[in-house]
Regions:
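A short, N-terminal "cap"/entry segment at the start of jelly-roll beta-barrel domains
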Residues: 1-38, 121-130
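Asparagine-centered strand-capping/turn motif at beta-strand->loop junctions
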Residues: 98-99
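Short acidic-glycine-tyrosine-enriched beta hairpin
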Residues: 75-90
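Glycine- and acidic-residue-biased ligand/ion/polar-headgroup-sensing regions
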Residues: 59-69, 74
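A short hydrophobic beta-strand segment most commonly corresponding to one strand
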Residues: 40-42, 87, 102-118
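Well-ordered beta-strand scaffold positions
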Residues: 43, 68, 76-78
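Conserved short histidine dyad/triad with adjacent acidic residue
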Residues: 26-28, 41-56
Length: 130
């Protein structure tokens, strides 16, 4: 299959987040589109899910599509919901806790790419802090 510049959500590479607490969908990465400087995903975390604290060696951006939760970035808590953008610098610990009312769906951008490949290979275990 050739590189795709337009990818429908239904055609994304999909896997399980957080030990069954949600789903990742990789829309844009080097494998699918040839993107060398960023990747783009759409993730859904199930309501009531508590994410595991982790960090990446790359910058990380979220854009919340639906649902509400709390983002912890560098030890500080932020209430987040639809139409909000969130940024975590490279190397900074972060996690997401989802509220109990509804699932949390958000766009993720990694720049440069990399963490999405760990998700493909290891799923939720990719970012365990041990």
């Amino acid at each position: 299959m050739g590189k795709r510049y337009v990818v429908a959500l239904k055609d994304a590479v999909t896997g399980v987040l957080y030990g069954g607490g949600g789903t990742f969908r990789i829309l844009i990465d080097e494998e699918s589109s040839g993107a060398k400087h960023l990747s783009c995903l759409v993730n859904t975390m199930n309501r009531g899910t508590r994410g595991s604290e982790h960090k990446h060696d790359v910058e990380h951006l979220w854009y919340i599509l639906s649902g509400k939760g709390t983002m912890y970035i560098g030890g500080k808590a932020y209430a987040v919901g639809p139409e909000m953008a969130v940024f975590a610098p490279a190397g900074v610990l972060h996690r997401i806790d989802v509220g109990s009312d509804e699932d949390l769906t958000y766009v993720v951008v990694y720049a440069p790419p990399g963490p999405e490949q760990q998700l493909k290979q290891f799923g939720a275990r990719a970012f365990d802090q041990r």
